[in-house]
Amino acid sequence: VTEPFRDPTLPPHERVRDLLARLTTEEKIGLLHQYQRPIPRLGIASFRTGTEALHGLAWHGPATVFPQAIGLASTWDPDLVQQVGAATAAEVLVFHTKNPATVGRNVWAPVVNPLRDPRWGRNEEGYSEDPWLTGVMAVAYARGLAGPHPHRMDTAPTLKHFLAYNNETDRCTSSSHLPPRVLHEYELPAFLPALREGVAVAVMPSYNLVNGRPAHLSPLINDVLRAAAPDELMVVSDAMAPGNLVDPQHYYDDHATAYAHALRAGIDSFTQDDDRAEATLAHLRDALDRGLITEEDLDRAATHILSVRVRLGEFDPEPLRRVDPDTVNSPAHQALARTAARRSIVLLKNDGILPLRDPRRIAVIGQLADTLMEDWYSGTLPYAITARAGLAERTETVFCEGVDRIALRTNEGYLTASADGTPMTITPAPGFGPVAESAAFDLFDWGGAWALRAVVNGRYVSEDENGHLTNDQPGPNGWEVRQTFRWQPDPNGTGVLQHIATGRYVAVGDNNTVTLTPDADSAAVFAIDTLRSGATEAAAIAATAE
């Protein structure tokens, strides 16, 4: 060991102080982007924040996928959740060893937003509507992610999203009303336990405003969160949030001013423009030259960042705990995932059906019976077993989704799909005989929202970039669900379809192509022809089973 910052026998704060004193101003600024610049003259590699690990490592190839966070909390078993966190950390280490440039050890998990609104489309990411349970589970998962070593972390857990974040619509410009009592009795009790225990070492603010102020500028970052943490706390922005301070929030007129205020409010790492750090570093340099920030502001942020890197053991002679590559999706991790899944199930009612008594044939019925639901932060599944497939391993099964098969008819003809998923059209109705397969759709009624799956290719109806309806989507696969419609009936037994994501209406355009229009009066009026009753089919299937 030649430099004190590389000496693991020294306290972390002494190592950070030594390293910071060796850095130039430009090198300090280079640390403040998500993709931190290397410092070759000191032998310091680049560093990347932000590996998704909400319930297993995500987005980097097949890895163990554990139950979603809300399922983990349903186990009410902190020890089990800690084991899941430890298994996730081990797999992160394997992937990091293979590709340190793209798989960093600062993990963006757990999510600790209390689930206060059932309409929030991201509730599966959090643990509970109860802040106490959320805090308990956050401590457990973060402790597993951080690892068992008392002085060195396997990964650096990050709590998100601070603060009062339960809304996706206009999430960058909407403001959450947060009275003091709600803050202190509901929101903070979910965030503070993992910070006080020292198992979470970073926090990510949320996109929204709180009481009219962007969350990325909240005084609570320095006054409350950092006061709760026993060590230096790193604060990372959410993706593109620094730029949001100028547009669309219009809180500041220029980026240098916005970034200066964010830095002074406590943001250390700017997640902006993906791996293109140049603009962010230029804005911070501009802010320094204009006197909007000082060298001390840079030192403070760099200290928070370097403290985490020191505690990750990056500068130690042996910087990583060695993990067998076969740990990824190992039998032990598969067994742990199965245990977590089993314990996450909550039995609400049982009319003598369970436990199953070795029936010879089981009817599996329902829209989700043969579907494995994933969330945005699911990892790449090494294998998939649906309810239908799992029961089929035990005994003979018969199956149907129990959905109606329909055709949608206008005065000009039927809504028609193509096998290749090109824009849909209206085609004339046949003079006699059955409706063509291309005009048949399976109707999934989610209660106020319909999804239409084209029989001709098994793909869902959505809109393309030109505003045409197409049947080319395997299912919801983006940040927002764009494959649902609202049926608006009229007194004549017909109705119109409104695309929920855009608020526009299904209409007939040029050459009988099917488009979306903002004008309700121009919407196509449809009659529904039921080709097959899902309820009737389900009853018939059920009658053949025990």
Per-segment meaning from a language model:
Residues 1-546:
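Glycoside hydrolase catalytic-domain context in secreted enzymes
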